[in-house]
Amino acid sequence: MSELKIKAAKAAIAYIEDDMVIGVGTGSTVNFFIKELAAIKHKIEACVASSKATEALLRAEGIPVIDLNSVQDLPIYVDGADEVNERGEMIKGGGGALTREKIVANVATQFICIVDESKVVKRLGEFPVAVEVVPMARSFVARQIVKLGGDPEYREGFVTDNGNIILDVFNLNFSTPMALEDSLNVIPGVVENGVFAKRLADKVLVASASGVNNLK
């Protein structure tokens, strides 16, 4: 599986141009992308990290990291996904960085999703949806999610970079992913959720034994 993740990471490097500021996501496939990026770090201007973990990895490779607030234009954002379909709709946030990932993705002109073939699905929903919640609202949000048909589980001992907690939600209805994304976000106490149906991936680079294909 690592070999496929490396393939996908290498394929994304082809989209990096000189003097670019690059948005960098979070997760195991992105970690391989950071290694590949380190080899051309002299060509790029800097990176915007979607998590403290990613920032630490970038800095460890000697890659400059800048704050999103100092950026007006972000040409490209590279990130993985827990699930992705052929339309570029995704479930993300298994690592808990979904809020910052969604923010950086929305700033970026182009979102390149890098995955191995196991992450490609016809219909989203096997993987649970991470929902970032203000701690005091945990029980209330969980009750509201149950009303939506979901089964929330508290991610014990996990605190997001924003100081919040995560509810992992199973068995949600993905017949209309965009409506689901909205339905979760309007619950008071919800910061963000891991359904990416509004900000789609512009390119989905899928690595398999036979090579890397662009799903979109």
UniProtKB/Swiss-Prot annotation:
SUPFAM superfamilies: D-ribose-5-phosphate isomerase (RpiA), lid domain, NagB/RpiA/CoA transferase-like. One of its GO terms (molecular function) is ribose-5-phosphate isomerase activity. It catalyses: aldehydo-D-ribose 5-phosphate = D-ribulose 5-phosphate. The keyword Isomerase applies. It comes from Legionella pneumophila (strain Paris). Homodimer. This is Ribose-5-phosphate isomerase A. Catalyzes the reversible conversion of ribose-5-phosphate to ribulose 5-phosphate. Its EC number is 5.3.1.6. Keywords: Isomerase. The active site is at residue 101. Belongs to the ribose 5-phosphate isomerase family. It comes from the Bacteria. GO terms for biological process: D-ribose metabolic process; pentose-phosphate shunt, non-oxidative branch. It is an enzyme of class 5 (isomerase). Substrate binds at residues 26-29, 79-82, 92-95, 119. PANTHER family: RIBOSE-5-PHOSPHATE ISOMERASE (PTHR11934:SF0). HAMAP family: Rib_5P_isom_A. Pathway: Carbohydrate degradation; pentose phosphate pathway; D-ribose 5-phosphate from D-ribulose 5-phosphate (non-oxidative stage): step 1/1. GO terms for cellular component: cytosol. The gene is rpiA.
